[in-house]
Every structure is written in structure tokens, then in C-alpha cells.
């Protein structure tokens, strides 16, 4: 489990995996008591400086000693059906060494059905120790299946609570847009293309991925994707322009 300043979420996340043989929390210098709360619940907390999500996840799984690893983020919760499915699976010589886990996400007072959020998958979250590693992108990192076997999919879903409020949506879009700038460093960008990419992201999530079925929550998700995409390209454009403010001369009282 990776965490940074997640004191309000870490208790529930750790408590949902108390059935595991060990719980490893990779903390990146939290200042809000996240590490202390995780330790109090029995987790082993290791401090790993943040140098991108791929790097952080690889260093976190290197701390795990079990035969199987279940990767859970601090905004996710394991459910009883997933717990039971995992325990039954690993006890019976499963056909795959790497499994994806569906997620059911909650936002603005409702379980989200559209926007591409259900079922929602990220990188495989259940895998044999040594069967998978993450690529080193700073955000939206990929993965490599090292097992040589097909990737399986669990039947049951974990829960995800990605945002407590709109402020967190804005904060995440700002942070992720900055982390995503290096991924488009090779592209020629303009403010017009930034708007175009952002608009397409909104249309994709709100129309084609049916965000509209979730009311205002679906609109906020789509608009958040517009913002994250637009600002990623706009920040890259800003880097290319290298704008500098005009220099001012010291002003003194004139002699009269």
C-alpha cells in the first residue's frame, strides 16, 4: 500500500486487509500522522521518497516477503467477497500468477456506473512475488507481466473512494497534469491543441463512456478529465515558451 498524507483514509484501507499475513505501507514523508496510524493498526511502514509512482510501487513490493502480493491504494477498500476469492484462489494452484481486480468507485454520494469507472481497472493488483513489475512513468504507470502466463481477472470488486470532495478533484488534476508533462515532451503543442485534447477527454468520458448517466457526478468526472488533460498540455506549452517577466529598474526619488 502506498500513501502520502492520507490520515483520513489509511485506517479504513489497512483495516480492510487485516486478514493478510503482513501489511506493508510505503509512506512518502507524510506529515499528517498517516504513518503513525498505519503502524498502530499493525502495518509495517517503510519510508520511500517519491520519485514517481512506478518507482514507488516497485520499491514497495520489494519490501514484501509473502509468496503473493495484493496491492491496495489508500483510497481503496478490500471487500469480503474479494478477500474470500483471493484466499481460495491462492490456496488452489491458480492458472495465472497475475490478476486484475475490478473496482467500484464512489463519488458525490453515489456509486458511479458510467465514465468508464465501472468496472474500473488499474494495473494488476494481485500477483505472485516476482511475477510483475511496474514501468517507471511518473504517473499512470504501466506494468510488465514477468510470469509468462495469461493475466487473470477476479470476479468480485474492491471499493474505491477517489475523492472526498471537489477540492481533492482539483488538487489531483493539478498534480497529475504536472506529473504527466514529461510524457508529452516529444509532442508539438499549442494552447489550441491543449483545449482540443481537453475537450476530447470531456466528450469521451461524458458521452462515449456514458458519464451523463451519473448526473452531476458524471459531469464533474468528465470536467476533471478536461482540466487534467488541458493543463498537462498547457503546462508543456508554457515550458516551451519559457516566458520571463519584464525586468524593472530600481526606482529612486528624482532630484528636483
Where do the language-model regions lie?
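Short, well-formed alpha-helical segments that are part of the catalytic scaffolds
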Residues: 1-22
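Acidic helix N-cap motif at the loop->helix transition within catalytic regions
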Residues: 8-11, 32-41, 81-82
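A conserved acidic beta->alpha catalytic loop
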Residues: 16, 27-37, 73
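Short, structured coil segments at secondary-structure junctions
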Residues: 19, 40-42, 122, 147
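Short, well-ordered alpha-helix to beta-strand connector turns
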Residues: 20-21, 42, 64-66, 96
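Conserved donor nucleotide-binding strand/loop of the catalytic core
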Residues: 35-63
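Catalytic-site signature of metal-activated, phosphate-bearing donor transferases
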Residues: 54-61, 68, 72, 79-243, ...
Amino acid at each position: 500500500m502506498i500513501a502520502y498524507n492520507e490520515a483520513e483514509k489509511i485506517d479504513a484501507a489497512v483495516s480492510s486487509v487485516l486478514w493478510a499475513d503482513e501489511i506493508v505501507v510505503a509512506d512518502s514523508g507524510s506529515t499528517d500522522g498517516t504513518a503513525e496510524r498505519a503502524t498502530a493498526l499493525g502495518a509495517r511502514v517503510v519510508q520511500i521518497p517519491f520519485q514517481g509512482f512506478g518507482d514507488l510501487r516497485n520499491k514497495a513490493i520489494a519490501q514484501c516477503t509473502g509468496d503473493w502480493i495484493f496491492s491496495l491504494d489508500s483510497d481503496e477498500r478490500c471487500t469480503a467477497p474479494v478477500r474470500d476469492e483471493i484466499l481460495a484462489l491462492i490456496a488452489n494452484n491458480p492458472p495465472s500468477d497475475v490478476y486484475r481486480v475490478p473496482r467500484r468507485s464512489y463519488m458525490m454520494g453515489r456509486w458511479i456506473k458510467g465514465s468508464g469507472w465501472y468496472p474500473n481497472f488499474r494495473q494488476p493488483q494481485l500477483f505472485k512475488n516476482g511475477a510483475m513489475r511496474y514501468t517507471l512513468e511518473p504517473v499512470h504507470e504501466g506494468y510488465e507481466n514477468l510470469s509468462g502466463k495469461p493475466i487473470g481477472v477476479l470476479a468480485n470488486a474492491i471499493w474505491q473512494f477517489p475523492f472526498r470532495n471537489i477540492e481533492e478533484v482539483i488538487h489531483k488534476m493539478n498534480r497529475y497534469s504536472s506529473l504527466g508533462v514529461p510524457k508529452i515532451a516529444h509532442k508539438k503543442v499549442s494552447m489550441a491543441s491543449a483545449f482540443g485534447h481537453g475537450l476530447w477527454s470531456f466528450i469521451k468520458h461524458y458521452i462515449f463512456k456514458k458519464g451523463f448517466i451519473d448526473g452531476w457526478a458524471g459531469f464533474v468526472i468528465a470536467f476533471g478529465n478536461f482540466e487534467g488533460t488541458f493543463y498537462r498540455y498547457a503546462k508543456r506549452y508554457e515550458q516551451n515558451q519559457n516566458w520571463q517577466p519584464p525586468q524593472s529598474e530600481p526606482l529612486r526619488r528624482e532630484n528636483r
